[in-house]
Amino acid sequence: MPRFQKNDNFIDKTFTVLADLVLKILPATKQEKEAFSYYRDGMSAQSEGEYAEALENYYEALRLEEDPYDRSYILYNIGLIYASNGEYVKALEYYHQALDLNSQLPAALNNIAVIYHYQGVKASEKKELDLARTLFDKAAEYWKQAIRLSPNNYIEAQNWLKTTGRSDTLTI
């Protein structure tokens, strides 16, 4: 049964209806429509915590989608799933692939920074201070890029940069 037929969530149902209308109205090839349908189903499954199903849909959307900008969002969402499952190396790979296609994706930059920060905290707890410092510096660089793209977001990151003395090159 297609995902849109079993949605109980009002927001998901609304999104599905709107997405179907957009697909009917906008000129798109059959392949583009099919790619978007898989992407939509992936987002719906992801929002319900059905990560395996979401990944299947995203991979199929990725296979069909040719537009680099649209592919960047598919890759970003795949990264989100891997990060949610604690598979940070894979998440980083997908976030970087998304950025290769769309360098104006502050959420991917932020999520990379969050992973490096988390790894820095873990290294600190293990008293691996040089590694922790390196990871925190990497987090700082990615947060600075995200903040440059979206200066009104990432307030906590801005505060962290200031309190850790890493905001010296932050120009918004």
UniProtKB/Swiss-Prot annotation:
UniProt-recorded name of the protein: Photosystem I assembly protein Ycf3
SUPFAM superfamilies according to UniProt: TPR-like
Repeat positions for TPR: 35-68, 72-105, 120-153
Bilayer topology: Peripheral membrane protein
PROSITE patterns: TPR (PS50005), TPR_REGION (PS50293)
Organism encoding this protein: Guillardia theta (Cryptophyte)
Chief localization: plastid
Highest rank taxon of the organism: Eukaryota
Keyword terms of this UniProt record: Chloroplast, Membrane, Photosynthesis, Plastid, Repeat, Thylakoid, TPR repeat
